[in-house]
Amino acid sequence: MAGTVLLAYYFECTDTFQVHIQGFFCQDGDLMKPYPGTEEESFITPLVLYCVLAATPTAIIFIGEISMYFIKSTRESLIAQEKTILTGECCYLNPLLRRIIRFTGVFAFGLFATDIFVNAGQVVTGHLTPYFLTVCKPNYTSADCQAHHQFINNGNICTGDLEVIEKARRSFPSKHAALSIYSALYATMYITSTIKTKSSRLAKPVLCLGTLCTAFLTGLNRVSEYRNHCSDVIAGFILGTAVALFLGMCVVHNFKGTQGSPSKPKPEDPRGVPLMAFPRIESPLETLSAQNHSASMTEVT
């Protein structure tokens, strides 16, 4: 976990990994959209996004686990499913705390892992945003841009702000789409797997679909503001979905308890088992041999 957090920090806050310089056409209409401004000027700012992504599944897990623990029937099943981990002579980790730590810990790990995958994809591909040419401000009077079908590999042709150009080279996959769908799907899998409601059958579907719809609208907002291409958002959705499904199904096993495997019965010690006496069965060869021996003794006599 510490290594994952450290790697995410290097991707986000340092220049350790340089973005690939991808070429472009000076007259590419897909890269000439208006500049939407910084990320802080977006309708969904990074601060709001990260707070909602981290707080929503964590709050759902806390509320769900505490509610189930205080229901008698559910508490008994949880205690039967979970093992109690001894942490000392006088302290132990009860099933409620253990489930909360496990589910929130796996969620946090997946959040950092998704961020790493997204940053790695953006660094390796260097895919250009829809507003790249607007902030790049290439020198259209140069010989390279005079030809309409000339592919430009020289990154020095840009005359705009270098920091903005650097961010404009990070489009594939969409980080907002990947993180939002991961968080929404993880929370949805938890709700459908653990929370049981008999009073209202529409409560869980409405809550789950509302959560997924929020993630979907986050991706659409990136496209509508010309911050990402449609392909970037789709790739982000696929990446976040894959991470959430893997962790939910293969790591926490659909949020079920970790029952210990039934221990195999120990074989009985043969030294403590009394021996059983079986009747002796006389062999026909022994009988015939005894008769021949008796006859020979009679002849000698």
State each model region's role.
Residues 1-106, 116, 120-133, 152-159, ...:
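N-terminal transmembrane-helix/juxtamembrane module of multi-pass inner/ER membrane proteins
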Residues 98-102, 113, 137-299:
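Membrane-embedded catalytic cores of phosphoryl/pyrophosphoryl-handling enzymes
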Residues 109-110:
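Alpha-helical transmembrane segments of multi-pass membrane transport proteins
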